[in-house]
């Protein structure tokens, strides 16, 4: 919407302000409007890049490089005097007793005469007394031609048992010689197994195979239409029970055959 004032110049509604005009109104998010199709402007002033939020610690002159890659020797504090070793009173007392001094009044003068008897430092004690590390065998110099470990050609019993007494040549591994040897051995075994001089051993049949073969042989037998054998005295006797020749049981009951009617007629007579 464009408003036309009396002067004839057009002005946008958002530029029209009523009342007091302040510069802070341009930074007020409640009054500022984003132009159409643009991002809303930032309404706060960023601090200068040199401003640091929070506490700024002092830079440590000794960084990671000085700690990990630079070796610094120990420097004694200048304000402290060098600590001198104290007198070895146990040794002085033994020496005084060996000299025939047995009273406490004679000990101060004896200690002044033997002021050089001091306690040994830890470095002096370790240097004088043999340690466990000093008893370990030393490695001979390389100029003597000594060999440490086992040579490259040595094969243990476990390696010999698993991979053979010798290492296979790299030439055979690259050229596939062992693969060709495996194929040749299998072809020789196949040719030896298919020879005519070897007798054929048929497989042993199981009970299931025998049962199937017997049923198939009975099924494939031709039908025998000959009259079944009977004794001469039974040839003139009629059958008492008819032979079931197929069909459903219900049909045989509802529609009996001629022989069944004859058998039913003779049943009450018996």
UniProtKB/Swiss-Prot annotation:
GO CC aspect terms: motile cilium
Subcellular location per the Swiss-Prot or TrEMBL entry: Cell projection, Cilium, Flagellum
Family according to the record: Belongs to the CFAP77 family.
Main location: other
Organism domain of life: Eukaryota
Region (Disordered): 128-148, 215-270
Chain intervals with Acidic residues compositional bias: 258-270
Name this polypeptide is given: Cilia- and flagella-associated protein 77
Keywords linked to the UniProt accession: Cell projection, Cilium, Flagellum
Role summary: Microtubule inner protein (MIP) part of the dynein-decorated doublet microtubules (DMTs) in cilia axoneme, which is required for motile cilia beating.
Family matches, as PANTHER family: CILIA- AND FLAGELLA-ASSOCIATED PROTEIN 77
Polar residues compositional bias, start-end: 128-145
Keyword Cell inner membrane in annotation: no
